[in-house]
């Protein structure tokens, strides 16, 4: 099978999709657009080992840089896809338009921003990227007071990392108990 497959995304799904294509014998062009300036990486450690300083950035990578070169996967980091034209079979990134035969969108989700928190004047951090985790880690210190909005897995993992760093933590959850969703 040949042609050009464009993958939009920079996380585990995007990196794994590129590997699955090559493992299945796909010999066409594979181009991966990652909006962040990094090779595709796993996001779950951002709220656990990476946030706690137990893992480094290289340990998050889905594949090392050499894998992409060896498997003829073109990775464009810092490449935000701004437009997809499914009728013309094109994507536009950085003002440049390129064709595709098949398109895989593996962008994941974005955190829900809370206007009241954003407008409060208090320092607010959201966790989605490596840089977000770095910012949160820099705020974690003994005696710091941290409020975590949300009692789901991510919120509780961030709270645990903050406590491990010696911060005082309050978890705010709209439901009666954490982990109910």
Locations of the language-model features?
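FAD-binding core/adjacent interface of flavoenzyme oxidoreductases
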Residues: 1-5, 61-147
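Beta1-alpha1 glycine-rich phosphate/pyrophosphate-binding loop at the start
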Residues: 2-74, 159-181
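Glycine-rich Rossmann-fold phosphate-binding loop(s) that bind the pyrophosphate
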Residues: 9-12, 128-129, 149-154
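Glycine/alanine-rich phosphate-binding loops at beta-alpha junctions
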Residues: 38, 82, 156
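Glycine/Thr-rich phosphate-binding loops of Rossmann-like dinucleotide-binding domains
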Residues: 113-114, 156-157, 180
